[in-house]
Curated annotation (Swiss-Prot):
Source species taxonomy: Eukaryota, Metazoa, Ecdysozoa, Nematoda, Chromadorea
Keyword vocabulary terms for this entry: Chaperone, Endoplasmic reticulum, Membrane, Transmembrane, Transmembrane helix
Official protein name in the record: DnaJ homolog subfamily B member 1
MF terms in GO: Hsp70 protein binding
Annotated compartments: Endoplasmic reticulum membrane
Region span, Disordered: 50-122
Main location: endoplasmic reticulum
Domain J: residue ranges: 137-201
Domain of life assignment: Eukaryota
Compositional bias ranges of the Basic residues kind: 88-99
Gene: dnj-1
Family: Belongs to the DnaJ family. DNAJB12/DNAJB14 subfamily.
Low complexity bias (residue ranges): 59-69
Amino acid sequence: MTADANKSESLLCMDKAREAIKSGDTDKARRMLLKAKKLDPGQNIEFLTKKIDDMTNNTSSSSQTSSSRASEERSYAHDDHYDDPNLRNRKARSPVKKNGKTEPEPKQRSASRTPKLGVDYTSEQKELVERIRHCKDYYEILKIDKKASDDDIRKEYRKLALKLHPDKCRAPHATEAFKALGNAYAVLSDTDKRRQYDQYGAEAANSHTPTTRRRGGGHGAFFEHDYAHGFEAEFTPEEIFNMFFGGGFPTEQVRRRARYAQQQQYHHYEQQQSPYGPLLQLLPLIAIMVIGLLAQLMVGEPAYSLHQTSKFTIKRLTADLRVPYFVRTDFETSYRGRIRQVEQQVEDDYIQNLRMNCYKEQNLKETKLYRARWMRDEAMMRDAERTPLPSCIRLNEIYSH
């Protein structure tokens, strides 16, 4: 089981390396490749390593510019030490003197160095967290019915996970809600676990769950459930999120918090300078709503399908990974000049599906091995060891390409 887990982690590192190469982060790509090789010595990393070397050679001429930019960032980092409370206290004890009189420091500088106090979450985020904490079952968490398809489950998880991830949502109990959401997706996206969950139901599970706690009182009381309901997921909510999105939030955590602090300082300064501060703060939200509305109006039918349908009948292969996909008869005319971008999206979707299916296959195999060891059944053990892993094999082929 440990070897299978290491191979699974190795595949995830290979996927992160591929994403880092696409974004131009060669240092991160090398780290991920070395980690993948360490987890699985049989992993083939030569192709991607050569790709990184080629990228490094092509960008060597811009190294001086990168060095000067790094020096500039270090100077800013040095300037950030002024946020240290001890330094602020020293400056407060040593006021500026002019003509024998003590003068306070400029307000503008003080305001820019003072962190903004108060909550850093929206009412919408708080309402979302509270809604999930009050849910009685997994279907209610994802806001779907019991006949929802796998696509519906993935769609709702994607939408809610981006809103609830701890790096983005800092409302009270957000971590608890994020864990509940991850466990709901892990159970409902697995055919066997979903069937068991539907069979026993949330109420039946609660009657055997010792971690259910009473909250509130009177008619307004609610139960804070153990969201596992006896169907605990093999992966943590963070691992599920990384499987689904390729680890997007964790890699950006530091930079996003820095941008957030800068934005808060800027808004604080703007509020002091302009009476229209509250209105200006609403402008980004209004812009996002308008852009979202326009995007909904402009969205048409997808350009391709990974499966042949009555509309998508023409089979094509991507230029890089030779992934099969299907398009309409007018595809080349409608997407002239954009075919490369479409094929990139095809490969991204294909790899994401393989990654999720590989985790499920590994999970199924590990479950069979565990049951065989628990029952001490050699026949079951042999059957578990022969469990096919087609998605994992295909991922290995792609990374060896």
